[in-house]
């Protein structure tokens, strides 16, 4: 699935990634069924797999480390979200493990510019070649949006968390919408070339209004695996973007 990214420039990769409106939180499923999940997602041409890497220090939860990135099939786009105390070391390990997209927490590192600049020089393998590492910045619900201003030129993905990581407390829908509006206002004419992502316990009925506001992608885990209906739920969630945005380049198998 990721062969279409081989040899593309950073700008072309971002444009292509923007046509995939869903990143599947693969760790939310039953690990014993991982092979079945991956087969279903491949059949749906759903390349983006989202992995939350937590170390129990940035937030009170442990998940997996960079080793998990390497274990996933090479055919997928591995979308890694770092929620760790040492983002620099973790970012290096994730690139070595084959992560295609790496999102840092704005609150997690005073040396964000250094890490993002380094990531901007890295490439990772895809089927048939290589692609540049796509860089993201993520913000907790209470983090002021203007902290991203100094690094806007160093990121392609801006991710707003709708939950407090490791705690599960959610933003009210009205507050989330206001935050999206504030982000769009902040970006202004720098909106082009940025993928805006919402991550955190969204329900399907929240999607239409968020899509109408102009977001590009959502990250979903538990909701997609609900009732052991990953394929059906993935189709349904992707269809929401098709109806609302008429995304021309959305994969046809949905």
From Swiss-Prot:
It comes from the Bacteria. Keywords: Cell membrane, Isomerase, Membrane, Metal-binding, Transmembrane, Transmembrane helix. InterPro entries: Aldolase_TIM, Ribul_P_3_epim-like, RibuloseP-bd_barrel. It is found in: Cell membrane. Its EC number is 5.1.3.-. A divalent metal cation binds at residues 50, 52, 81, 199. GO terms for cellular component: plasma membrane. The chain crosses the membrane at residues 14-34. Binds 1 divalent metal cation per subunit. GO terms for biological process: carbohydrate metabolic process. Belongs to the ribulose-phosphate 3-epimerase family. This is Putative epimerase LsrE. The lineage of its organism: Bacteria, Pseudomonadati, Pseudomonadota, Gammaproteobacteria, Enterobacterales. The gene is lsrE.
